[in-house]
Regions:
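Repeated loop/turn-to-beta-strand initiation elements of outer-membrane beta-barrel proteins
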Residues: 93-95, 129-133, 180-184, 227-229, ...
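Gram-negative/organellar outer-membrane beta-barrel architecture
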Residues: 58-67, 73-212, 368, 376-390
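C-terminal outer-membrane beta-barrel translocator/porin domains of Gram-negative envelope proteins
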Residues: 216-221, 225-324
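Outer-membrane beta-barrel "beta-signal"
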Residues: 217-220, 357-363, 379-390
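Membrane-embedded beta-strand positions of outer-membrane beta-barrel proteins
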Residues: 68-70, 86, 104-108, 133-137, ...
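Transmembrane beta-strand segments that form the barrel wall of outer-membrane beta-barrel proteins
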Residues: 55, 65-74, 99-112, 118, ...
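Bacterial Sec-dependent N-terminal signal peptides
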Residues: 1-32
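Transmembrane beta-strand segments of outer-membrane beta-barrel domains in Gram-negative
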Residues: 26-55, 64, 134-138, 145-267, ...
């Protein structure tokens, strides 16, 4: 079974071979080309095998340990597509091995439905961990579906409209170390959402199709995780307060409070239990593009992201992660979530479940390629990505 999985994964991986290695010279006669065919084939597959065999080895001699992987995928939302992800690990202070390395991930995707995506995420840890900088930038174009705002709107499968969603976001964050594992700082966030080709524009209830949102925020966090992209132990807690005032050019003035708690515990050999409780709460005149969204590849997996949306969101998930053989692993998770207009109108009966299973392949040292299949209430979805969901 493991061999079959390995073969299947190898078939979908993209390997970029230097051009001069394949050509083996600027000019080649037909005879010389025939004579070197077997050599080139053997060289290609040897390099292919060695690339992925060595990709998860720690390379301390490299200033920037960078690798790339990609392949086809399928999901109920985006259909058949081709995704590419790249991961890099580095240390700003290469002599200090006591702190977690910095990491950066670049990702791109294109599918047969017309969806395309390009993004970058990263965490930079400065010498002695005095400062941390986080970056999250992306752009995508997606033929989307919109049910409206509120639980009742989302639960009606047929009450929806189609439109094309173009979204771009830049979020920069800088944190200062106040005490061991305790950080505080500020961020800036810009997001633009443009909705085009609505089948039924009445779903927006007169709201603007193009929404720009810009604002600063304050952050305080406690982080004892041993490795940010894939923790094996530790605790993470963060409180974030974002402001989007009208005087900064926002059409709608509102505020957002986000809380995030995560705990990681080693169990038996190769086993980790991870849990997360997360909430997002909006106050003021929140535009339709900035209300809290349920679903996607990081939480409440199985649900179409944004089918259920409202001012406020609370969600919880617990995931069991087990390494089974060499670089291969499996996961299983369960959880629940709820969207609601405000705390006074929270209803337990509107809580939705999520559960699923996943496969992990260690692409780089403690950096996993993630294949998940999630289930919700009458829905399911497949996800391909890099790094753990949380």
């Amino acid at each position: 079974m493991i061999q079959r999985i390995t073969r299947a994964l190898s078939l979908c991986l993209l390997l970029f071979i230097p051009f001069h290695d394949i050509m083996a010279g600027e000019f080649m006669t037909r005879d010389s080309l025939n004579n070197t065919t077997d050599t080139l084939k053997n060289g290609f597959f040897h390099r292919f095998y060695r690339y992925f065999e060595q990709s998860n080895k720690v390379k301390e001699e490299k200033k920037f340990d960078f690798s790339i992987i990609g392949g086809p995928h399928f999901s109920s939302d985006t259909k058949l597509g081709l995704g590419v992800v790249a991961s890099g690990l580095f240390r700003i202070d290469r002599e200090d091995k006591t702190i977690s390395p910095s990491n950066i991930s670049l990702y791109g995707d294109v599918t047969t439905t017309g969806f395309y995506l390009l993004g970058i995420r990263g965490n930079m840890i400065f010498p002695k961990d005095r400062f941390r900088a986080n970056i999250n930038m992306y752009f995508f174009s997606f033929p989307s579906e919109y049910w409206g705002i509120g639980y009742d709107a989302g639960k009606d499968e047929d009450h929806k409209t189609e439109y094309k969603r173009l979204e771009q976001q830049v979020k920069l964050e800088l944190l200062y170390k106040l005490a061991p594992n305790l950080y505080a700082g500020a961020n800036l966030m810009f997001r633009n959402v443009t909705a085009r080709n609505f089948d039924d524009i009445t779903f927006l209830n007169g709201a603007k199709k193009n929404v720009n949102t810009f604002g600063p925020g304050l952050v305080i966090s406690y982080d004892s995780r041993d490795f940010i992209p894939n923790p094996a132990r530790g605790f993470f807690a963060q409180l974030e307060q974002q402001f989007f005032p009208g005087w900064l050019g926002n059409d709608d003035s509102f505020k957002r409070t986000s809380v995030d708690f995560r705990y990681y515990q080693k169990m038996w050999k190769g086993a980790i239990l991870a849990s997360q409780l997360q909430g997002t709460f909006n106050y003021g005149d929140t535009p339709w593009s900035m209300v809290s969204l349920m679903g996607g590849s990081y939480a409440m997996r199985g649900y179409y992201e944004g089918r259920y949306r409202d001012n406020d969101l609370i969600q919880f998930q617990v995931e069991y992660r087990q390494k089974i053989y060499n670089r291969h692993g499996i996961t299983a998770w369960g959880g629940a979530g709820n969207v609601f207009p405000d705390m006074d109108k929270f209803k337990w009966k509107q809580t939705l479940p999520t559960y699923g299973i996943g496969y992990r392949w260690e692409f780089k040292n403690r950096v996993n390629v993630r294949l998940d299949y999630g289930f919700g209430k009458g829905v399911s979805a497949f996800y391909f990505g890099i790094n753990e969901a949380f």
